[in-house]
A protein has these predicted regions:
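Cap/lid segment of the alpha/beta-hydrolase catalytic domain
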Residues: 142, 148-236, 247, 292-297
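Mobile cap/lid helix-loop segments that gate and shape the active-site cleft of serine hydrolases
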Residues: 218, 224-225, 240, 278-318, ...
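Gly/Ala-rich beta-loop-alpha elbow adjacent to hydrolase catalytic centers
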Residues: 260-264, 268
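C-terminal catalytic histidine-bearing segment of alpha/beta-hydrolase fold enzymes
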Residues: 347-388
Length: 388
């Protein structure tokens, strides 16, 4: 009996030391390597770019990853993910809506030849009926992979589902390969193309009346008053769509992919970081550094999370996806999310995946173009890693 007790307490002490060492390792390296003092020398004149660069260089980045082992990845992710969800406002939604039951309503259904196309609304909050298009492959049996395709900035919220407002829009959509949900259903996936919060029917009444394509600024301002963010709202919507799909559709829960372009790439990256049910994240024309993209040039207000650099860079947030699959699609001529900055961020992301023991589970695809979707990179990655 005494021997069993000694063995038990020895094992417990050993495991406690491992966790403590991992946690202390994070705290020590982050404190020593990340915290930086600001340059206190007086400057003769004001330069906005120099001022912001100084702020970015002195950002705390308390959750910037510095580990080297899978155990350190686990400890870091557990703490960072909770903090990120709190900062985005997702934790608040989880607390306030703990007993809320999502509801969905089918609006119409039609056979479009290659698929069944249905329009739905889903109540992701009591006051938020969110429109989405559901594409179902025909003549498929058993559980199927699911792809959710959040869109970016534009007037039409149904482009990804292959629904266009004009012939010119159709041409531009096909050139930019924006029919992401159509690509998915044609490859045997169940596809959901949701309206992004702040667009379409979820705009303000004033913006609808003036035909303003989106209400992102208003959404951000109102969210900030209650500790929420548009990114958090949109990630919440993705999670509620997953809840509904798993309950109502023949979905293979081991193959849930999220992929969108630009603002849809933002939602994709953050959703993969926050919701571990997502097995693969493929953001297009978004993955970069915060400082080299939204911190350097004009971007829509919905891109911003207060104090995000207190936590880390975009590569750290993407690292919360590890060891699950992650592929970023970037255009070599994208001026909004410059390739040079994306490559810099990817070096850091690769270190996280290497520490997690799965360096091949993340890829950077460089497309020969600008700010658009790159289906070749997406589907090469999917076909390589889709769990059969």
């Amino acid at each position: 009996m005494l021997m069993k007790s000694i063995i038990y307490w020895s094992a417990l002490l050993s495991s406690t030391l491992i966790v403590t060492q991992c946690t202390n390792y994070q705290k020590t390296t982050q404190k020593d390597d990340i915290l930086r003092e600001r340059d206190l020398a007086y400057k003769d004149s004001f330069s906005a770019s120099a001022y912001y660069e100084d702020l970015y260089n002195s950002a705390e980045m308390k959750y910037a990853f510095k580990g080297t082992t899978p155990e350190e990845v686990d400890v870091w992710q557990t703490e960072f993910r909770d903090k990120l969800k709190e900062r985005l406002g997702i934790s608040q939604l989880e607390r306030q809506l703990a007993s809320f039951k999502i509801k969905a309503r089918k609006i119409n259904s039609e056979d479009i030849g290659y698929a069944i196309r249905e329009r739905w609304e889903i109540w992701t909050e009591p006051t938020v009926p969110l429109p989405f298009v559901l594409l179902l492959p025909k003549n498929k049996e058993g559980n199927l992979p699911l792809m959710i395709t959040p869109h970016g900035h534009g007037k039409n919220t149904e482009t990804y589902a292959g629904i266009y407002l004009s012939e010119q829009e159709r041409i531009e959509g096909e050139i930019g390969e924006r029919n992401v949900a159509v690509q998915a259903v044609q490859n045997g996936f169940i596809a959901i193309a949701p309206t992004s919060r702040g667009f379409g029917k979820t705009r303000t009444s004033e913006d609808k009346a003036k035909d303003v394509p989106y209400s992102c600024r208003t959404l951000l301002m109102q969210d900030l008053l209650v500790g929420r963010t548009p990114i958090g709202d949109r990630v919440w919507d993705i999670s509620k769509l997953i809840d509904w799909a798993l309950a109502e559709l023949p979905v293979d829960k081991s193959n849930i992919i999220v992929s969108g372009n630009s603002g849809g790439g933002t939602t994709t990256l953050f959703a993969g970081a926050c919701d571990t049910r997502i097995s693969m994240s493929i953001p297009s024309s978004y993955f970069c550094t915060f400082t080299g993209s939204i911190g350097t040039m004009y971007h829509c207000d919905c891109n911003y999370v207060p104090g995000i650099l207190e936590y880390g860079e975009m590569s750290d947030i993407a690292g919360l996806t590890a060891p699950r699959f992650f592929c970023t699609l970037n255009g070599k001529d994208d001026a909004m999310f410059p390739l040079k900055e994306a490559q810099k961020a990817f070096v850091n992301l690769k270190k996280i995946y290497t520490a997690a023991g799965v360096p091949d589970n993340c890829e950077l695809y460089i497309g020969n173009g600008g700010h658009r979707y790159y289906k070749e990179g997406a589907w090469n990655f999917i076909n390589k890693h889709l769990l059969k």
